[in-house]
Amino acid sequence: MADTALNANLRKTATKSIVKEIRNNGGIPGVVYGKHVGSMAISVDAKDLKNILGSVTGRNTLINMNINGSKQTVMVKSLQMDPMHQNIRHVDFQQVSENTKIRTVIPVQLVGTPKGVAMGGVIQHDLRSAEIECLPNRIPEAIQVDISGLEIGDTLSVSDLNLPPGVKILDHPHTTVVGLATIKAPEPAGQPEVPPEPAEEAKAKTIEKE
């Protein structure tokens, strides 16, 4: 089911010194958990993991993990990042089964140029990622939305999306995905106050005295 390989090493302890040593040697500490494996503390090579995350499928890549000779199909479930340097400090892997549906998040990509753009329409992309449910081997790289037919004032909602067979989107059907709006022209500035003519100003002062 998975064609991307990743080697992992079991680690029996999780002391600060062991974790620091793993990172200093180019590794990333992590955990694999699932129905059939329980929870296992592991470490993986940082470069190998970054290559997987940088691929087209990214975190939704099905990984054939070799854990000291034991093969498990897993996916990246969560990452703990170093906020200062944006390095991965810890990774959680979830074991998956080819017969069990899972939930994950995939990007929503817009395709085409709306008709209304020529009339001054502006694209408003509201839903940039969507939560889906499907079997692991049916996870699409992205949901592509054809917006070429949109005119000013048109919108597309989750219920309008065309999904691959076996894929269910979990976002609310009425959630707006994309729309074509117009930018309001700035209202003209107020007319500057015109000072009264000298004669009118003098007349006004005379009336005030009376």
Swiss-Prot record:
According to the UniProt entry, where is the signal peptide? none
Q: Where is the composition biased (Basic and acidic residues)?
A: 200-210
Q: Which UniProt keywords apply?
A: Ribonucleoprotein, Ribosomal protein, RNA-binding, rRNA-binding
The UniProt entry, under Pfam families, shows: Ribosomal_L25p (PF01386), Ribosomal_TL5_C (PF14693)
Superkingdom? Bacteria
Q: What family classification does the UniProt entry report for this protein?
A: Belongs to the bacterial ribosomal protein bL25 family. CTC subfamily.
CDD domains from the xrefs? Ribosomal_L25_TL5_CTC (cd00495)
Single GO cellular component term: cytosolic large ribosomal subunit
Q: Which GO terms describe its molecular function?
A: 5S rRNA binding; structural constituent of ribosome
**What biological-process terms (Gene Ontology) are attached?**
translation
The name under which this protein is listed is Large ribosomal subunit protein bL25
Asked whether the UniProt record includes Ribonucleoprotein among its keywords, one would answer yes
Complex and partners: Part of the 50S ribosomal subunit; part of the 5S rRNA/L5/L18/L25 subcomplex. Contacts the 5S rRNA. Binds to the 5S rRNA independently of L5 and L18.
RNA-binding recorded as keyword: yes
Q: What does this protein do?
A: This is one of the proteins that binds to the 5S RNA in the ribosome where it forms part of the central protuberance.
Renumbered residue ranges of the record's region Disordered: 185-210
| Organism name | Desulforamulus reducens (strain ATCC BAA-1160 / DSM 100696 / MI-1)
